[in-house]
Protein backbone atom coordinates (compact mmCIF):
# COMPACT_ATOMS: atom_id res chain seq x y z
CA UNK A 1 0.00 0.00 0.00
CA UNK A 2 1.39 3.38 -1.03
CA UNK A 3 1.70 5.82 1.87
CA UNK A 4 2.21 9.43 0.78
CA UNK A 5 4.73 11.72 2.42
CA UNK A 6 2.53 14.48 3.81
CA UNK A 7 5.19 17.09 3.21
CA UNK A 8 4.99 16.39 -0.52
CA UNK A 9 1.20 16.23 -0.34
CA UNK A 10 1.15 19.70 1.23
CA UNK A 11 2.98 20.97 -1.85
CA UNK A 12 0.17 19.65 -4.06
CA UNK A 13 -2.36 21.26 -1.75
CA UNK A 14 -0.55 24.60 -1.84
CA UNK A 15 -0.48 24.67 -5.65
CA UNK A 16 -4.25 24.16 -5.74
CA UNK A 17 -5.02 26.60 -2.92
CA UNK A 18 -2.68 29.32 -4.21
CA UNK A 19 -3.67 28.71 -7.85
CA UNK A 20 -0.12 28.31 -9.10
CA UNK A 21 3.44 27.14 -8.40
CA UNK A 22 4.95 30.57 -7.70
CA UNK A 23 2.50 31.52 -4.95
CA UNK A 24 2.64 27.99 -3.55
CA UNK A 25 6.42 28.31 -3.21
CA UNK A 26 6.00 31.62 -1.37
CA UNK A 27 3.41 30.08 0.94
CA UNK A 28 5.68 27.13 1.78
CA UNK A 29 8.84 29.29 1.96
CA UNK A 30 10.65 27.09 -0.55
CA UNK A 31 11.70 27.53 -4.17
CA UNK A 32 9.35 26.97 -7.07
CA UNK A 33 11.66 24.19 -8.23
CA UNK A 34 11.28 22.45 -4.86
CA UNK A 35 7.50 22.56 -5.18
CA UNK A 36 7.72 20.95 -8.62
CA UNK A 37 10.09 18.27 -7.31
CA UNK A 38 7.79 17.35 -4.43
CA UNK A 39 4.79 16.98 -6.70
CA UNK A 40 6.86 14.93 -9.13
CA UNK A 41 7.85 12.62 -6.26
CA UNK A 42 4.17 12.07 -5.48
CA UNK A 43 3.34 11.40 -9.12
CA UNK A 44 6.20 8.90 -9.39
CA UNK A 45 4.99 7.17 -6.22
CA UNK A 46 1.46 6.72 -7.57
CA UNK A 47 2.49 6.19 -11.17
CA UNK A 48 0.09 8.78 -12.58
CA UNK A 49 -0.40 12.55 -12.84
CA UNK A 50 -1.90 14.20 -9.77
CA UNK A 51 -2.12 17.69 -11.22
CA UNK A 52 -3.52 19.04 -14.47
CA UNK A 53 -1.13 21.84 -15.34
CA UNK A 54 -3.70 24.36 -16.52
CA UNK A 55 -4.12 27.96 -15.38
CA UNK A 56 -5.03 27.69 -12.60
CA UNK A 57 -3.81 24.12 -11.94
CA UNK A 58 -6.40 21.57 -10.86
CA UNK A 59 -6.08 18.10 -9.31
CA UNK A 60 -6.72 14.89 -11.21
CA UNK A 61 -9.17 12.36 -9.79
CA UNK A 62 -6.34 10.67 -7.86
CA UNK A 63 -5.11 14.08 -6.74
CA UNK A 64 -8.58 14.87 -5.38
CA UNK A 65 -8.54 11.67 -3.32
CA UNK A 66 -5.15 12.53 -1.84
CA UNK A 67 -6.25 16.07 -0.98
CA UNK A 68 -9.34 14.69 0.73
CA UNK A 69 -7.07 12.38 2.74
CA UNK A 70 -4.89 15.35 3.69
CA UNK A 71 -7.93 17.27 5.00
CA UNK A 72 -8.89 14.35 7.24
CA UNK A 73 -5.35 13.87 8.53
CA UNK A 74 -4.96 17.59 9.31
CA UNK A 75 -8.15 17.66 11.38
CA UNK A 76 -7.32 14.50 13.31
CA UNK A 77 -3.72 15.63 13.84
CA UNK A 78 -4.84 18.97 15.27
CA UNK A 79 -7.14 17.17 17.67
CA UNK A 80 -4.49 14.64 18.71
CA UNK A 81 -2.02 17.43 19.43
CA UNK A 82 -4.57 19.11 21.65
CA UNK A 83 -4.63 22.41 19.79
CA UNK A 84 -8.39 22.56 20.05
CA UNK A 85 -8.11 22.76 23.81
CA UNK A 86 -5.05 24.98 24.13
CA UNK A 87 -5.96 27.44 21.40
CA UNK A 88 -2.29 27.79 20.46
CA UNK A 89 -3.01 27.17 16.79
CA UNK A 90 -6.49 28.07 15.53
CA UNK A 91 -7.92 25.20 13.52
CA UNK A 92 -8.69 26.01 9.88
CA UNK A 93 -12.08 24.71 8.78
CA UNK A 94 -12.80 25.03 5.07
CA UNK A 95 -16.51 24.61 4.34
CA UNK A 96 -18.47 24.88 1.09
CA UNK A 97 -21.80 26.65 1.57
CA UNK A 98 -24.49 28.11 -0.63
CA UNK A 99 -24.96 31.87 -0.59
CA UNK A 100 -28.55 31.73 0.67
CA UNK A 101 -27.61 29.64 3.72
CA UNK A 102 -24.77 32.05 4.44
CA UNK A 103 -27.17 35.00 4.21
CA UNK A 104 -29.77 33.45 6.51
CA UNK A 105 -29.13 30.69 9.03
CA UNK A 106 -25.56 29.36 8.84
CA UNK A 107 -23.64 32.05 10.74
CA UNK A 108 -26.12 32.15 13.65
CA UNK A 109 -25.87 28.36 13.75
CA UNK A 110 -22.10 28.55 14.23
CA UNK A 111 -22.09 31.54 16.60
CA UNK A 112 -21.45 29.61 19.81
CA UNK A 113 -18.84 27.33 18.24
CA UNK A 114 -16.95 30.31 16.84
CA UNK A 115 -16.99 32.20 20.13
CA UNK A 116 -15.96 29.22 22.26
CA UNK A 117 -13.38 27.52 20.02
CA UNK A 118 -10.10 28.48 18.28
CA UNK A 119 -11.37 28.18 14.71
CA UNK A 120 -10.52 30.01 11.51
CA UNK A 121 -13.34 29.62 9.00
CA UNK A 122 -12.72 29.50 5.27
CA UNK A 123 -16.21 29.62 3.78
CA UNK A 124 -16.23 28.88 0.07
CA UNK A 125 -19.48 30.09 -1.50
CA UNK A 126 -20.88 27.87 -4.22
CA UNK A 127 -24.32 26.96 -5.54
CA UNK A 128 -25.94 24.26 -3.43
CA UNK A 129 -25.99 21.97 -6.47
CA UNK A 130 -22.18 22.12 -6.68
CA UNK A 131 -20.89 22.37 -3.10
CA UNK A 132 -20.53 18.59 -2.78
CA UNK A 133 -18.01 18.63 -5.63
CA UNK A 134 -15.69 20.76 -3.52
CA UNK A 135 -15.80 18.09 -0.84
CA UNK A 136 -15.15 15.41 -3.46
CA UNK A 137 -12.11 17.35 -4.70
CA UNK A 138 -10.74 17.68 -1.17
CA UNK A 139 -10.99 21.47 -1.17
CA UNK A 140 -13.15 21.52 1.96
CA UNK A 141 -13.93 19.30 4.95
CA UNK A 142 -17.68 19.91 4.97
CA UNK A 143 -20.39 21.06 2.58
CA UNK A 144 -24.01 22.20 2.65
CA UNK A 145 -25.59 20.60 -0.41
CA UNK A 146 -28.91 19.52 -1.93
CA UNK A 147 -27.44 16.08 -2.65
CA UNK A 148 -28.91 13.46 -0.28
CA UNK A 149 -26.33 10.74 -0.97
CA UNK A 150 -23.03 10.69 0.92
CA UNK A 151 -19.73 10.44 -0.94
CA UNK A 152 -17.45 7.48 -0.17
CA UNK A 153 -15.83 7.85 3.28
CA UNK A 154 -18.22 10.67 4.14
CA UNK A 155 -21.22 11.23 6.40
CA UNK A 156 -24.47 13.05 5.60
CA UNK A 157 -27.38 14.41 7.66
CA UNK A 158 -30.52 16.25 6.62
CA UNK A 159 -30.63 19.87 7.77
CA UNK A 160 -34.01 21.04 6.51
CA UNK A 161 -35.39 23.00 3.59
CA UNK A 162 -35.41 26.57 2.36
CA UNK A 163 -38.66 27.61 0.69
CA UNK A 164 -38.14 30.12 -2.13
CA UNK A 165 -40.92 32.59 -2.94
CA UNK A 166 -41.35 34.54 -6.18
CA UNK A 167 -41.46 38.11 -4.86
CA UNK A 168 -41.30 41.75 -5.91
CA UNK A 169 -42.20 45.20 -4.67
CA UNK A 170 -45.78 46.46 -4.99
CA UNK A 171 -44.60 49.04 -7.52
CA UNK A 172 -42.95 46.36 -9.65
CA UNK A 173 -46.11 44.24 -9.54
CA UNK A 174 -48.27 47.18 -10.59
CA UNK A 175 -45.94 47.99 -13.47
CA UNK A 176 -45.41 44.50 -14.90
CA UNK A 177 -48.42 42.56 -13.64
CA UNK A 178 -51.40 44.97 -13.62
CA UNK A 179 -53.69 42.09 -14.59
CA UNK A 180 -51.95 39.44 -12.49
CA UNK A 181 -48.93 37.22 -13.04
CA UNK A 182 -49.47 35.69 -16.48
CA UNK A 183 -47.26 33.93 -18.95
CA UNK A 184 -47.28 36.87 -21.37
CA UNK A 185 -46.55 39.41 -18.63
CA UNK A 186 -43.62 37.36 -17.33
CA UNK A 187 -41.91 37.55 -20.72
CA UNK A 188 -41.26 41.26 -20.10
CA UNK A 189 -40.51 41.17 -16.37
CA UNK A 190 -36.79 41.09 -15.47
CA UNK A 191 -35.59 38.45 -13.01
CA UNK A 192 -32.18 37.87 -11.41
CA UNK A 193 -29.88 34.83 -11.11
CA UNK A 194 -26.82 34.30 -8.93
CA UNK A 195 -24.70 33.13 -11.88
CA UNK A 196 -25.14 31.58 -15.31
CA UNK A 197 -25.62 28.12 -13.75
CA UNK A 198 -28.36 29.27 -11.34
CA UNK A 199 -31.54 27.85 -12.85
CA UNK A 200 -33.97 28.19 -9.94
CA UNK A 201 -36.16 30.89 -11.48
CA UNK A 202 -36.07 29.08 -14.82
CA UNK A 203 -37.27 25.85 -13.22
CA UNK A 204 -40.01 27.71 -11.32
CA UNK A 205 -41.28 29.58 -14.39
CA UNK A 206 -41.12 26.51 -16.60
CA UNK A 207 -42.95 24.33 -14.08
CA UNK A 208 -45.70 26.83 -13.29
CA UNK A 209 -46.01 28.95 -16.44
CA UNK A 210 -44.54 26.73 -19.17
CA UNK A 211 -41.83 29.28 -19.94
CA UNK A 212 -38.72 27.73 -21.51
CA UNK A 213 -35.25 28.62 -20.15
CA UNK A 214 -33.88 31.93 -21.39
CA UNK A 215 -37.26 33.39 -22.30
CA UNK A 216 -37.28 36.19 -19.70
CA UNK A 217 -34.76 39.04 -19.23
CA UNK A 218 -32.31 38.13 -16.49
CA UNK A 219 -29.70 40.01 -14.46
CA UNK A 220 -26.68 38.16 -13.03
CA UNK A 221 -25.73 39.22 -9.49
CA UNK A 222 -23.44 37.15 -7.21
CA UNK A 223 -25.04 38.18 -3.93
CA UNK A 224 -28.02 36.86 -2.00
CA UNK A 225 -28.33 40.15 -0.13
CA UNK A 226 -28.42 42.04 -3.44
CA UNK A 227 -31.43 39.97 -4.54
CA UNK A 228 -33.40 41.47 -1.66
CA UNK A 229 -32.20 44.98 -2.46
CA UNK A 230 -33.07 44.61 -6.15
CA UNK A 231 -36.55 43.42 -5.26
CA UNK A 232 -37.10 46.15 -2.66
CA UNK A 233 -36.10 48.93 -5.05
CA UNK A 234 -38.42 47.62 -7.76
CA UNK A 235 -35.74 46.53 -10.23
CA UNK A 236 -36.58 42.82 -10.53
CA UNK A 237 -38.77 40.01 -9.34
CA UNK A 238 -36.77 37.34 -7.52
CA UNK A 239 -36.75 33.86 -6.06
CA UNK A 240 -35.75 34.52 -2.43
CA UNK A 241 -35.87 32.27 0.64
CA UNK A 242 -38.87 33.03 2.84
CA UNK A 243 -36.52 32.95 5.83
CA UNK A 244 -34.57 35.87 4.38
CA UNK A 245 -37.50 38.24 3.80
CA UNK A 246 -39.92 37.58 6.65
CA UNK A 247 -39.82 41.24 7.77
CA UNK A 248 -40.27 42.60 4.25
CA UNK A 249 -43.26 40.34 3.63
CA UNK A 250 -44.85 41.25 6.96
CA UNK A 251 -44.42 44.98 6.34
CA UNK A 252 -45.66 44.75 2.76
CA UNK A 253 -42.39 46.06 1.33
CA UNK A 254 -42.28 42.86 -0.71
CA UNK A 255 -45.21 40.75 -1.86
CA UNK A 256 -45.53 37.10 -2.84
CA UNK A 257 -46.42 37.23 -6.54
CA UNK A 258 -47.63 33.62 -6.69
CA UNK A 259 -49.22 32.66 -3.35
CA UNK A 260 -49.15 28.91 -2.82
CA UNK A 261 -46.39 28.39 -5.39
CA UNK A 262 -42.78 28.06 -4.27
CA UNK A 263 -39.54 26.15 -4.81
CA UNK A 264 -38.31 23.96 -1.96
CA UNK A 265 -34.62 23.11 -1.58
CA UNK A 266 -33.83 20.42 0.98
CA UNK A 267 -30.32 20.87 2.38
CA UNK A 268 -27.90 18.23 3.66
CA UNK A 269 -24.68 18.48 5.66
CA UNK A 270 -21.81 16.41 4.24
CA UNK A 271 -18.42 15.89 5.88
CA UNK A 272 -15.55 13.43 6.03
CA UNK A 273 -15.62 10.41 8.32
CA UNK A 274 -14.40 9.93 10.96
CA UNK A 275 -15.19 13.30 12.52
CA UNK A 276 -12.87 15.06 14.92
CA UNK A 277 -14.38 16.42 18.12
CA UNK A 278 -14.36 19.91 16.65
CA UNK A 279 -16.11 18.82 13.48
CA UNK A 280 -18.65 16.99 15.65
CA UNK A 281 -19.37 20.29 17.40
CA UNK A 282 -19.84 22.00 14.04
CA UNK A 283 -22.11 19.17 12.89
CA UNK A 284 -24.23 19.30 16.03
CA UNK A 285 -24.55 23.08 15.79
CA UNK A 286 -25.64 23.00 12.15
CA UNK A 287 -28.12 20.17 12.63
CA UNK A 288 -29.63 21.61 15.82
CA UNK A 289 -30.07 25.11 14.40
CA UNK A 290 -31.17 23.84 11.00
CA UNK A 291 -33.91 21.78 12.61
CA UNK A 292 -35.14 24.92 14.41
CA UNK A 293 -35.31 27.35 11.49
CA UNK A 294 -35.53 25.25 8.31
CA UNK A 295 -38.60 23.40 7.07
CA UNK A 296 -38.65 19.77 8.22
CA UNK A 297 -41.74 18.48 6.37
Curated annotation (Swiss-Prot):
Record has Transcription regulation as a keyword: yes
GO molecular function: DNA binding; DNA-binding transcription factor activity
SUPFAM superfamilies: Periplasmic binding protein-like II, Winged helix' DNA-binding domain
Gene3D superfamilies reported for this sequence: 3.40.190.290, Winged helix-like DNA-binding domain superfamily/Winged helix DNA-binding domain
Limits of the HTH lysR-type domain: 4-60
Coiled-coil parts of chain: none
DNA-binding region: 21-40
Keyword Transmembrane belongs to the record: no
InterPro entries, A to Z: ArgP (IPR017685), ArgP_gammaproteobact (IPR023490), LTTR (IPR050176), LysR_subst-bd (IPR005119), Tscrpt_reg_HTH_LysR (IPR000847), WH-like_DNA-bd_sf (IPR036388), WH_DNA-bd_sf (IPR036390)
Keyword terms, alphabetized: DNA-binding, Transcription, Transcription regulation
Role: Controls the transcription of genes involved in arginine and lysine metabolism.
Family: Belongs to the LysR transcriptional regulatory family.
Subunit (UniProt): Homodimer.
This protein's name: HTH-type transcriptional regulator ArgP
Source organism (scientific name): Klebsiella pneumoniae (strain 342)
Gene that encodes it: argP
Amino acid sequence: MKRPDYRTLQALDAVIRERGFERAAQKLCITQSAVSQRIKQLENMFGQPLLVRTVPPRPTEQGQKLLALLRQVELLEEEWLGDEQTGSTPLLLSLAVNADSLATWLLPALANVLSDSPIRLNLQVEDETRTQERLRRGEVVGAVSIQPQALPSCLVDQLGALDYLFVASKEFAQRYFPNGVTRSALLKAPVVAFDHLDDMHQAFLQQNFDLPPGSVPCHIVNSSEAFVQLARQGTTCCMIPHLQIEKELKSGELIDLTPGLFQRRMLYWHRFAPESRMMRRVTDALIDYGHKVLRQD
